């Protein structure tokens, strides 16, 4: 790329470009030139690859051809969306001077910087998903983490204590852009993440952070926000706020507070648990067949985003949960009336953010007006609902009659996309604007009258009056009649078959019309800006209303889901345990064509661990996951897929279900499995719900069985967590005999020949066999292989008859059965050479063996 070392060698325009580019060296610069945004040098080469646009050359500057690429200004949003999705940031440089009055290059400046984490434009955002900017900080005591959704003003910070908790937060929030200090130590935590931005250390200084935050919120200290004693979180928040101010280059009135997220307030789920439970993303990275795909029938984008936040942060405050349950119950008979009205509210939350940033477009204001028009009907529908929480939401929604009437007066019904196109402000709102418009709009009548008058006066039937953007107004006469044009007709343009003229009267009117159009557009822009000034003082109340409407949408949605899917209202208990009657998996039951087999579950202080056995594909993993999902739904305040549920305190949910090689980090399947297991054993408590599936299968049989046994023992005896432990190691079914609080359950199956029928029904006691060969046959393994496997199984079973006898039907071997001691008689016989014995010695050996037996 050309540098600014020798600016004099460049043209004035390129000098201007290079100075601006030097201020933004690491991001693309969109440089406005007329109707295009141009990119030069390395930016042009990079953009041509990222956007698949042509790379050309523009003359020369400093003796070298200039690589150039460009995009039309009217299509800029589409190109920005592509770049943002690839993690790129773009500085938008606009012409702010008037080309008509400027000598040399038109004055330009960067008016905004578009980054993946700070976008607010509707075209760039996914409407049903939060778009977060985050900052991470680390010192010897732990991590600081802050997130901001600039499209709503939601500002959060936390202080994860360790690497695992920090990893879980990164997965939960999934930021579009992540700021980190240049000396950040745990680089493996953030490697491969999108939108990484390295920031200087001074941006994370605690004193600077406090000053920035107090300035933003208009406060003297941060005590009122409950974050005063969170120095690591504040360091991250300070850097984040500085970055937003640098990129947005405007005030941020919608960012009014900051909230501390504390671990003790919510059920903690690590990264593996969130992945395995497929809450909002399935294991393949998509959104099909996830919990959210079943539960999310919200009718507003902001409601959908709130529901997903609830799913990822289940709360432990039962007062909040009971209030949500009561609201859902009260709304179950009203959702058919409420949802069509709520649907009309749209994404008020993000419209308000654009209003705060002063980037709201005319159609945003029209949508805002439409949202406010729904409030009277919503308030009327909720007025007689006998529920205090519902009435609280109704009050928070507000009415905003004056603002609604203002927008009804000010903005036309279907405004254009951009205010610069004109025609946004409604007739009657401004008398002066109406006068300028009347003058401009009167041109059509005048031109029609002029055309008729001149045609009749001159007797020229080909005479027409018209207008184009290049030559302005003109009188056109065909080539055949052009010799009849009067002398005061001044030729303006010659065409193949016609001549175009101007007359003093038409020129005078043209100047008048163009002046009136310009005046009307300028006044309209001024009135539009004044609308912002009238709306922004009400921003805080409008944001409260948007939040209440989003929450109402979530709760109405949960009421509809509960009714439609036959969910029950769970009850909370102070005693540890989970009791589920006829529980179902919320996702699997929607996918299955046949009826889902519901199953019970009971975990209590005297029954803290269930050893779950049964065939592959028998439903063990489904049974375990449905328990976790029922608990998760209960702790967001939702109804749950069961006949009856009683649930005690839960502080964490852990899952160790399935694994795959982590090739990027050089970790095998077994290493991944053991890392997740170690995390559980270190962090689980007696109030944790733990799902352990097939521990130890990634190593040798004896190693795996020993590890599984020891893990189960530790969870049951030492940690005393509520545990579902699925295994194919039949030896673990002996655990209930050796320790208290452990019970066996199994999933039933019926085998007939080489076929197997899975009953998916949970029964007390251990499974009689694993049905592994039957499942292999079902999977299509060749018959000769199955036949050979059966032969080998019989051989293995015959080797250990004692172990086989301990099983119900002798089809499983006990690997931990004590090895038989070799008999002294056998040892003596092994050392005997019968061919060397005399008859007398042989007789003596018989008596000796008799004594050894």
UniProtKB/Swiss-Prot annotation:
GO cellular component, one term: cytosol
GO biological process, alphabetically ordered: mismatch repair
Entry annotated with the keyword Ion transport: no
CDD domains cross-referenced by the UniProt entry: ABC_MutS1
Function as written in the Swiss-Prot or TrEMBL entry: This protein is involved in the repair of mismatches in DNA. It is possible that it carries out the mismatch recognition step. This protein has a weak ATPase activity.
Listed NCBIfam families: mutS1 (TIGR01070), PRK05399.1 (NF003810)
Record protein name field: DNA mismatch repair protein MutS
Organism, as annotated: Klebsiella pneumoniae subsp. pneumoniae (strain ATCC 700721 / MGH 78578)
Taxon lineage: Bacteria, Pseudomonadati, Pseudomonadota, Gammaproteobacteria, Enterobacterales
Gene: mutS
């Amino acid at each position: 790329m050309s540098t600014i070392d020798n600016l004099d060698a460049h043209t004035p325009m390129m000098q201007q470009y290079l100075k601006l580019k030097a201020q933004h060296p690491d991001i693309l610069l969109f440089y406005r030139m007329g109707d295009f945004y141009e990119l030069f040098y390395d930016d042009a080469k990079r953009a041509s690859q990222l956007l698949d646009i042509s790379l050309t050359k523009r003359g020369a500057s400093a003796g070298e051809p200039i690589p150039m690429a460009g995009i039309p200004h009217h299509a800029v949003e589409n190109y920005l969306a592509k770049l943002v999705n690839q993690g790129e940031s773009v500085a938008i440089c606009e012409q702010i001077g008037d080309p008509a009055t400027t000598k040399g290059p038109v004055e330009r400046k960067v008016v905004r910087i578009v980054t993946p984490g700070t976008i607010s434009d509707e075209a760039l955002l996914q409407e049903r998903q939060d778009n977060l900017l985050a900052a991470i900080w680390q010192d010897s005591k732990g991590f600081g983490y802050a997130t901001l959704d600039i499209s709503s003003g939601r500002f959060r910070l936390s202080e994860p204590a360790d690497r695992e908790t920090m990893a879980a937060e990164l997965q939960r929030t999934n930021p579009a852009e992540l700021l980190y200090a240049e000396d950040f130590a745990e680089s493996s935590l953030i490697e491969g993440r999108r939108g990484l931005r390295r920031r200087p250390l001074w941006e994370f200084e605690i004193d600077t952070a406090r000053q920035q935050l107090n300035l933003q919120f208009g406060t003297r200290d941060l005590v009122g926000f409950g974050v005063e004693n969170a120095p690591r979180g504040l360091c991250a928040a300070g850097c984040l706020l500085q970055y937003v101010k640098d990129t947005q280059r405007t005030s941020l009135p919608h960012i009014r507070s900051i909230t501390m997220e504390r671990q003790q307030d919510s059920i903690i789920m690590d990264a593996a648990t969130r992945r395995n439970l497929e809450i909002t993303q399935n294991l393949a990275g998509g959104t099909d067949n996830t919990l959210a795909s079943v539960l999310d029938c919200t009718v507003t984008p902001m409601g959908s985003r709130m529901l997903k936040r609830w799913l990822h942060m289940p709360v432990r405050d039962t007062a909040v949960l009971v209030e949500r349950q009561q609201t859902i119950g009260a709304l179950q008979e009203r959702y058919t009336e409420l949802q069509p009205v709520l649907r009309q509210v749209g994404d008020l939350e993000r419209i308000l953010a654009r209003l705060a940033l002063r980037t709201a477009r005319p159609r945003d204001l029209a949508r805002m007006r439409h949202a406010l028009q729904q409030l009277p009907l919503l308030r009327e529908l909720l007025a007689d609902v006998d529920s205090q929480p519902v009435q609280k939401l109704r009050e928070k929604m507000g009415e905003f009659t004056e603002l609604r009437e203002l927008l009804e007066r000010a903005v036309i019904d279907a405004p254009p996309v951009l205010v610069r196109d004109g025609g946004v402000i409604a007739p009657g709102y401004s008398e002066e604007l109406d006068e300028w418009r009347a003058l401009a709009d009167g041109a059509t009548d005048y031109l029609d009258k002029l055309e008729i008058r001149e045609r009749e006066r001159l007797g020229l039937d080909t005479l027409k009056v018209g207008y184009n953007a290049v030559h302005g107004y003109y009188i056109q006469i065909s080539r055949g009649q052009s010799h009849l044009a009067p002398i005061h007709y001044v030729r303006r343009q010659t065409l193949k078959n016609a001549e175009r003229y101007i007359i003093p009267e038409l020129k005078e009117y043209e100047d008048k019309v163009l002046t009136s159009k310009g005046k009307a557009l300028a006044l309209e822009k001024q009135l539009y800006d004044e609308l912002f000034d009238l709306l922004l003082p009400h921003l805080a109340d409008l944001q409260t209303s948007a939040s209440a409407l989003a929450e109402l949408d979530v709760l109405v949605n949960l009421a509809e889901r509960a009714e439609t899917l036959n969910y029950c209202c769970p009850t909370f208990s102070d005693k540890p345990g989970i009791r589920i009657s006829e529980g179902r998996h919320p996702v699997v039951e929607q996918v299955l064509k046949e009826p889902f087999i519901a199953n019970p579950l009971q975990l209590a202080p005297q029954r803290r661990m269930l050893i779950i056995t049964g065939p592959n594909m028998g439903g063990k993993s489904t049974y375990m996951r449905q328990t976790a999902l029922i608990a998760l739904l209960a702790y967001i305040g939702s109804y749950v897929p069961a006949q009856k549920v009683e649930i005690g305190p839960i502080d964490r949910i852990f899952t160790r279900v399935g694994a795959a090689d982590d090739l990027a980090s050089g970790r095998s399947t077994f290493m991944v499995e053991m890392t997740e297991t170690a995390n559980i054993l270190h962090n689980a408590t007696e109030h944790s719900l733990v799902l352990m599936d097939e521990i130890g299968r990634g190593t040798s049989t004896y190693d795996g069985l020993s590890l599984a046994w020891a893990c189960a023992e530790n969870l049951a005896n030492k940690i005393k967590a509520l545990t579902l432990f699925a295994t194919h190691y039949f030896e673990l079914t002996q655990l209930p005999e050796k320790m208290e609080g452990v019970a066996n359950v199994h999933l039933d199956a019926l085998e007939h020949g080489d076929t197997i029928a899975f009953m998916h029904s949970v029964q007390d006691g251990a499974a009689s066999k694993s049905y592994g060969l039957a499942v292999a046959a079902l999977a299509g393994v060749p018959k000769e292989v199955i036949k050979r496997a059966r032969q080998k199984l019989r051989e293995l079973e015959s080797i250990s008859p004692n172990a086989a006898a301990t099983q119900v039907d002798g089809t499983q071997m006990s690997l931990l059965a004590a090895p038989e001691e070799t008999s002294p008689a056998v040892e003596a016989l092994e050392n005997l050479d019968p061919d060397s014995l005399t008859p007398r010695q042989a007789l003596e050996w018989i008596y000796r063996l008799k004594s050894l037996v």
